């Protein structure tokens, strides 16, 4: 994205939000407005969580803190939203952990392939001093702090062109990935052709054959309706994604102690409920997709793991910091 285009998008976001704020001002002149944006569809559990957090905070503060939610990429791509939160054009964003690696490289390890043993392992590490340390670096570098971590799910590959049983079947496969270097390295280790695309462009790209497939957790495949344009679900389970909730530091500073406690408490309550909903959906959706006509493939997972673990951790150790992989793995 060129610098001029990025400023054009940012200006457009700012103008739209300024208009919304001006319109609302007569009703809530004294309220602190926090705009929370996400690329996820309105029916995704993470967006349901956003709405519940907004309501609880509004109720507990008597309307003094008004969280406005903007799902479904209304305000831009993942990168756009993080940059807008950093600048203060919006105040809260939730995104996959590795997306923050563009500012603090250590964040990308949190979506490293085959790092997490399960959701519980991820939760233990992501509520540890590791996250506090990364958050402090994010505040210093880009004026954002992490105020919540949720479970986004275990990621699997889907294909619109062929069944994938072993990693050899990925050779030349056009795999959509987020704009994240660790995802690119993983796809390359598989022999695939990594193709970065914004999430909002993915459904159309799959339907038109611009890419052969993608990878995401089951609830995202469901909520974004990727099952409509993909024939095969391949249970690779290659990455467990923690989704980070970040707030602009100036916005955080504008809240008093009780308001901060209300926001954190609501995030803890509804974040846990969201995690449980994601886990429940993961337990049912394979059968749902199968009943809907998708072919479900249980691949040779070790053939996917081996080339990735042989190359990716060593490639990124200097970026992450020596010993960080082992420190996280020990939780």
For the regions a protein language model found, what residue spans apply to each?
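N-terminal secretory/targeting leader peptides
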Residues: 2-7, 13-22, 30-121, 129-331
């Amino acid at each position: 994205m060129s610098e001029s285009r990025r400023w054009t998008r940012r200006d457009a976001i700012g103008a739209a939000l300024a208009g919304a704020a001006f319109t609302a001002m007569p009703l809530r002149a004294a309220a602190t407005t926090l705009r929370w944006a996400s690329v996820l569809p309105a029916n995704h559990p993470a967006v349901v969580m956003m709405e519940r957090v907004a309501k609880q905070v509004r109720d507990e503060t008597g309307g003094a803190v008004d969280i406005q939610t903007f799902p479904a990429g209304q305000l831009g791509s993942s990168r756009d939203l993080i940059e807008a939160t950093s600048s203060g054009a919006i105040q809260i964003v939730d995104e996959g952990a590795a997306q923050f690696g563009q500012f603090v490289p250590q964040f990308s390890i949190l979506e490293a392939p085959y790092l997490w043993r399960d959701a519980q392992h991820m939760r233990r590490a992501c509520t540890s001093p590791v996250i506090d340390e990364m958050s402090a670096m994010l505040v210093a570098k880009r004026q954002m702090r992490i105020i919540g971590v949720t479970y986004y799910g275990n990621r699997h590959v889907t294909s619109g062109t062929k069944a994938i049983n072993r990693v050899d079947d990925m050779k030349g496969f056009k795999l959509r990935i987020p704009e994240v270097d660790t995802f690119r390295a993983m796809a390359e280790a598989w022999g695939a052709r990594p193709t970065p695309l914004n999430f909002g462009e993915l459904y159309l790209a799959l339907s038109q054959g611009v890419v052969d497939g993608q990878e995401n957790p089951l609830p995202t495949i469901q909520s974004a309706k990727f099952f409509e344009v993909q024939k095969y679900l391949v249970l690779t389970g290659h990455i467990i994604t923690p989704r980070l909730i970040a707030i602009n530091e100036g916005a955080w500073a504008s809240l008093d102690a009780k308001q901060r406690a209300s926001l954190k408490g609501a995030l803890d309550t509804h974040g846990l409920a969201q995690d449980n909903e994601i886990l429940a959906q993961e337990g049912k959706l394979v059968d749902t997709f199968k009943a809907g006509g998708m072919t479900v493939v249980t691949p040779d997972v070790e053939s996917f793991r081996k080339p990735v673990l042989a190359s990716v951790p060593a490639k990124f150790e200097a970026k992450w910091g020596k010993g960080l992989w082992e420190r996280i793995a020990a939780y």
